[in-house]
C-alpha cells in the first residue's frame, strides 16, 4: 500500500474510528470484521478496504498528498467538509437496506444521526445466530492487539467515536425490545475477548461499548462516557460479569474471563488501570441481574480503583491507590441497586433494607445498600470495621435498648444523607434543625434524646464522614439539659407520637395510649396519658381560659396561672411534668421564650396593653439555664419563636 502507517493511522482515527479501515485479507469476512481478525501483518488499519464491499470509501485516504495534488488543497478540502460532509452523503437518499452491509452502518461512525437511523431501522429484527455472534466477539477481542495500531489506538481512545466493529454483523447497537435475557449470551471465550483494548492502547474500545449499545435485560445500559479516554467496555454473560475498564492510551490489556459456572456469582475482578485523567468504570454484577456502575475518580496516581463484588454476601476484594477508604461494596449483597436506568423498568431508586439487618428501624439497612460513590471519603459500610457507619449503628443498637438510648447523631440519616427518610419528629425550635429519635417506639425512658448535632452526642464516625448540613448553634447545649431536668424520664419527651405520623399515632403496646391532639399555633400538643380521664382534664387546660387568657395557657408568665397551666406548659415544652411549676427543672427548655408572656409579645389585632416604653424587656435570668437571645431582637422575633415554631 502506498500510504505510510502514520498517515493511515491519522485517517483511521479521523474517519473510521480506529481500526475500521479494512485489513487487506480475509475476503470471506466483511471488511470491518477482518480489520480486527488478527491481521497484524499488513500496514495496520490503513490498508485499503475492498472497493466492492465499501462503495463510498476510496482506496486512497483523503489525507494522502498524492491524491490531493490533483485536487483542492488539503486545507480547503478540510474547511469545506468540516461540518457538512456527512450531510451531503448519498446514503441518506437511499432506502435503508435490511442487510448488515448497509451504507448507513458504514456511515454511522461519522454521524449520530446515521447511528440513530441505523438503530431505528433494526428494531424488531431477530437476533443473529449464536455462531455469528461468537465469531464476531472472538474476532473483536482477539485481533484488537494487532489492529489497534499505536497512534490509531491513541487517537481513537481520546476522541472516543464509535468503531465500525461495534456496529458490525450482529446488530450491536440495535434496541431489542423482545429479546429474552438468555438470548444474549456470550460464550466464555468471546466474553474474555471483550475485555481489553488494542495492544498499543486502544483502551476500552472492544466488542461492546456500554454507552452506545442498548443491550437486553442481562446487561443494563448506562449513559455513554464519551469524554473519558477509558470508556468502559463490558461483555456480559448470564453467569458472571466481565468488567474491565480500559486503560489510558498507554494502559495494559486487562482481561478477566467470565465465570459461567458460578451461577449467580459475579467475578471478583473489575480491574481498572485508569489513566491520570480517566475515570475507571468498574461494574459490579449480582446474580439477580443487578449491576452497580461505580464511577471512581482515581485521585492521584495512574492506578484506578479496583472494585470486586462477590454477591454471595462475603466481603469483596477492594483495593485502590486513591485516598478514598476501602469501599466494601458487597457487605450486603441484596442491597446493591444500580443507578436508575431509563431502559429498565423494575428498579428501585432507594435501596431496600436487606433481610439480614438486625438494627431496629433498618436505618443501617436503608443506607448500607448505597453504592460506594454516595459515601464520602473515609466512610465504609463494613460492619467489621470500627470506623464505619454500620458498625457504629450496630454497636449503638446493641449497647442500649431499642429506643433512643444511643446518641441520635450516630444515625446515618441524621445529617446529610441522600434519602431523608426520618424527616418527621423534628424539634420545633426555630434554631434546632436536627432530627430527634422517637422515644415512643421502645416505650422506654429516653433520657439522652439530645439533638442530633449536639457536639457531645454526635458519633465519631458521623463526624468524620458526614458534614452536617447546618452548623451547630450555641443554643444546642440546652437540649442536653433535658436529662437533668427530667426526673429519670418519668414520661418520654413528647416530640411526636410516631416518627412518621406527627399528629399522634397509637402504637399497640404503648403504656400511654391516650394522646392529646390539640393543635394550636404552636403545633400539635401530642401529650400522652394513661387514662381518658387524664386526657379530658388535660384538654380543659387548653380550653379553660376565656378571652385573651387563652393565649396564656401554655406560657406561665404570671404566678396566678402557673398551677392551672402546669400540664399544658409541660406539654408545649418538651419535658416531663417533674418538679414544681415554677422550678428551674420545669422551665429548663422553653421558659425563656414563654416567660416573657403576653406583655412583651406583639399582637397586631388585640387590645391588650403593650409594655411601657421605658420598661425593660423582662428576662427571666433565674428560671432558665441560659440567657434568652429572643428578648434582644424585639417583639416580632419573640412572637415567631413563641407562637409559630416551637
Curated annotation (Swiss-Prot):
Transmembrane segments: none annotated. The keyword Nucleus applies. Residues 1-11, 217-226 have a biased composition (Polar residues). Residues 34-52, 130-139, 227-240, 316-330 have a biased composition (Low complexity). A zinc finger (C2H2-type) spans 514-542. Residues 1-70, 121-332 are annotated as: Disordered. GO terms for cellular component: nucleus. The modification Phosphoserine is found at residues 102, 231, 237. Residues 16-28, 140-152, 189-205, 260-277, 300-315 have a biased composition (Gly residues). It comes from the Eukaryota. One of its GO terms (biological process) is negative regulation of gene expression. Its main location: nucleus. Keywords: Acetylation, Metal-binding, Methylation, Nucleus, Phosphoprotein, Repressor, Transcription, Transcription regulation, Zinc, Zinc-finger. PANTHER family: ZINC FINGER PROTEIN 503 (PTHR12522:SF3), ZINC-FINGER PROTEIN NOLZ1-RELATED (PTHR12522). This is Zinc finger protein 503. The lineage of its organism: Eukaryota, Metazoa, Chordata, Craniata, Vertebrata.
Amino acid at each position: 500500500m502506498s500510504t505510510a502507517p502514520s498517515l493511515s493511522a491519522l485517517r483511521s482515527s479521523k474517519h473510521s474510528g480506529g481500526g475500521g479501515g479494512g485489513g487487506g485479507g480475509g475476503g470471506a469476512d466483511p471488511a470491518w470484521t477482518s480489520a480486527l481478525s488478527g491481521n497484524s501483518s499488513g500496514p495496520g488499519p490503513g490498508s485499503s478496504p475492498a472497493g466492492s464491499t465499501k462503495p463510498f470509501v476510496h482506496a486512497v485516504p483523503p489525507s494522502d498528498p498524492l491524491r490531493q495534488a490533483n485536487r483542492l488543497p488539503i486545507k480547503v478540502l478540510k474547511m469545506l467538509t468540516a461540518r457538512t460532509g456527512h450531510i451531503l452523503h448519498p446514503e441518506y437518499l437511499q432506502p435503508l437496506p435490511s442487510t448488515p452491509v448497509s451504507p448507513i452502518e458504514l456511515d454511522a461512525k461519522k454521524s449520530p444521526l446515521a447511528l440513530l437511523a441505523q438503530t431505528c431501522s433494526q428494531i424488531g429484527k431477530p437476533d443473529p445466530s449464536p455462531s455469528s455472534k461468537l465469531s464476531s466477539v472472538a474476532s473483536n477481542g482477539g485481533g484488537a492487539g494487532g489492529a489497534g495500531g499505536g497512534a490509531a489506538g491513541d487517537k481513537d481512545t481520546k476522541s472516543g467515536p464509535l468503531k465500525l466493529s461495534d456496529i458490525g454483523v450482529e446488530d450491536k447497537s440495535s434496541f431489542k425490545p423482545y429479546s429474552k435475557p438468555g438470548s444474549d449470551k456470550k460464550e466464555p471465550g468471546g466474553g474474555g475477548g471483550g475485555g481489553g483494548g488494542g495492544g498499543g492502547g486502544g483502551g476500552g474500545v472492544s466488542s461492546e461499548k456500554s454507552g452506545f449499545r442498548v443491550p437486553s435485560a442481562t446487561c443494563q445500559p448506562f449513559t455513554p462516557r464519551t469524554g473519558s479516554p477509558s470508556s468502559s467496555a463490558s461483555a456480559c454473560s448470564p453467569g458472571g460479569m466481565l468488567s474491565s475498564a480500559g486503560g489510558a492510551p498507554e494502559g495494559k490489556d486487562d482481561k478477566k474471563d467470565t465465570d459461567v459456572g458460578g451461577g449467580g456469582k459475579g467475578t471478583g475482578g473489575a480491574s481498572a488501570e485508569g489513566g491520570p485523567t480517566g475515570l475507571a468504570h468498574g461494574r459490579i454484577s449480582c446474580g439477580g441481574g443487578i449491576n452497580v456502575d461505580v464511577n471512581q475518580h482515581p485521585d492521584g496516581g495512574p492506578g484506578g480503583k479496583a472494585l470486586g463484588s462477590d454477591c454471595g454476601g462475603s466481603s469483596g476484594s477492594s483495593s485502590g491507590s486513591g485516598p478514598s477508604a476501602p469501599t466494601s461494596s458487597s457487605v450486603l449483597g441484596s442491597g446493591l441497586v444500580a443507578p436508575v436506568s431509563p431502559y429498565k423498568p423494575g428498579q428501585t431508586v432507594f435501596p431496600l433494607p436487606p433481610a439480614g439487618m438486625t438494627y431496629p428501624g433498618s436505618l443501617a439497612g436503608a443506607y448500607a445498600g448505597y453504592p460506594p460513590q454516595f459515601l464520602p471519603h473515609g466512610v465504609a459500610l463494613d460492619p467489621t470495621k470500627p470506623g464505619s457507619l454500620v458498625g457504629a449503628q450496630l454497636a449503638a443498637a446493641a449497647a442500649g435498648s431499642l429506643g433512643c438510648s444511643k446518641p441520635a447523631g450516630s444515625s446515618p440519616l441524621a445529617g446529610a444523607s441522600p434519602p431523608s427518610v426520618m424527616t418527621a419528629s423534628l424539634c420545633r425550635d426555630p434554631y434546632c434543625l436536627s432530627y430527634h429519635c422517637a422515644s415512643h417506639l421502645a416505650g422506654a425512658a429516653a433520657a439522652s434524646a439530645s439533638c442530633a448535632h449536639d457536639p457531645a452526642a454526635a458519633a465519631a464516625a458521623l463526624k468524620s464522614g458526614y458534614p452536617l448540613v447546618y452548623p451547630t448553634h450555641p443554643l444546642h447545649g440546652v437540649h442536653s439539659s433535658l436529662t437533668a431536668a427530667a426526673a429519670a424520664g418519668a414520661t418520654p419527651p413528647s416530640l411526636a407520637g410516631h416518627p412518621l405520623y406527627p399528629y399522634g399515632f397509637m402504637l399497640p403496646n404503648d403504656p400511654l395510649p391516650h394522646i392529646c391532639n390539640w393543635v394550636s399555633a404552636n403545633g400539635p400538643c401530642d401529650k400522652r396519658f394513661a387514662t381518658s380521664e387524664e386526657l379530658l382534664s388535660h384538654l380543659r387546660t387548653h380550653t379553660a381560659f376565656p378571652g385573651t387568657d387563652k393565649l396564656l395557657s401554655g406560657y406561665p408568665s404570671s404566678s396566678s396561672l402557673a398551677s392551672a397551666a402546669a400540664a399544658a406548659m409541660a406539654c408545649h415544652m418538651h419535658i416531663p411534668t417533674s418538679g414544681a411549676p415554677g422550678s428551674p427543672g420545669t422551665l429548663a427548655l422553653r421558659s425563656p421564650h414563654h416567660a416573657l408572656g403576653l406583655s412583651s409579645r406583639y399582637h397586631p389585632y388585640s387590645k391588650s396593653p403593650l409594655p411601657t416604653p421605658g420598661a425593660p424587656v423582662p428576662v427571666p435570668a433565674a428560671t432558665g439555664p441560659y440567657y434568652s437571645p429572643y428578648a434582644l431582637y424585639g417583639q416580632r422575633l419573640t412572637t415567631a419563636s413563641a407562637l409559630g415554631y416551637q
